[in-house]
């Protein structure tokens, strides 16, 4: 059986639908690389943008949807939507049987393993698939991007970490007085 076969488990969840969750604030080249790779493994990939009211975000939910759609519009099997609450509940609500997680440095593994085990206790029918980050992007984080954008006006610097279509929006947000 290949990953993109239309297998449905006993719980009614489809293993041809996968969900990649994150804050995507902002979306990075590392995120895009995981999206592209996961879209080849599954018939449908839903990019779930988590909304956490307690966390200060650079981009609002609608802007994050638009940015992720912009960089993934070449992938016909990718959908983008927001969710709040537990990711595992969101995955089940879509009838998906797989959560995709990107792993950056080895330090990510401990946290992701803990989350995977908790998700398994909450819903044993949902599998987690880990995709290792490309070494070019393994060190990229939102904090790093914001620091580079704040300290350098050179868009070529930013383009090493974020898709070029994101740069104008990132620059505008960081230039706004409220940020």
UniProtKB/Swiss-Prot annotation:
GO terms for biological process: coenzyme A biosynthetic process. Its cofactor is Mg(2+). Its EC number is 2.7.7.3. It is found in: Cytoplasm. One of its GO terms (cellular component) is cytoplasm. Homohexamer. HAMAP family: PPAT_bact. This is Phosphopantetheine adenylyltransferase. It comes from Rhodopirellula baltica (strain DSM 10527 / NCIMB 13988 / SH1). The gene is coaD.
């Amino acid at each position: 059986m290949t990953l993109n076969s239309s297998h449905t488990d006993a719980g009614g969840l489809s293993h041809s639908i996968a969900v990649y969750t994150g804050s995507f604030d902002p979306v990075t080249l590392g995120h895009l690389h995981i999206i592209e790779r996961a879209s080849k493994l599954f018939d449908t990939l839903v990019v779930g943008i988590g909304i956490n009211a307690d966390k200060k975000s650079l981009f609002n939910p609608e802007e994050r949807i638009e940015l992720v759609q912009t960089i993934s519009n070449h992938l016909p099997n990718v959908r983008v939507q927001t969710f709040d609450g537990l990711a595992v509940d969101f995955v089940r609500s879509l009838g998906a049987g797989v959560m995709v997680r990107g792993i950056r440095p080895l330090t990510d593994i401990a946290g992701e393993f803990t989350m995977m085990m908790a998700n398994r206790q909450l819903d044993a029918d949902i599998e987690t698939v880990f995709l290792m980050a490309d070494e070019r992007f393994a060190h990229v984080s939102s904090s790093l991007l914001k620091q580079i954008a704040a300290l350098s006006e050179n868009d070529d610097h930013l383009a090493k970490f974020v898709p070029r279509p994101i740069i104008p929006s990132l620059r505008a947000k960081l230039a706004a007085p409220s940020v």
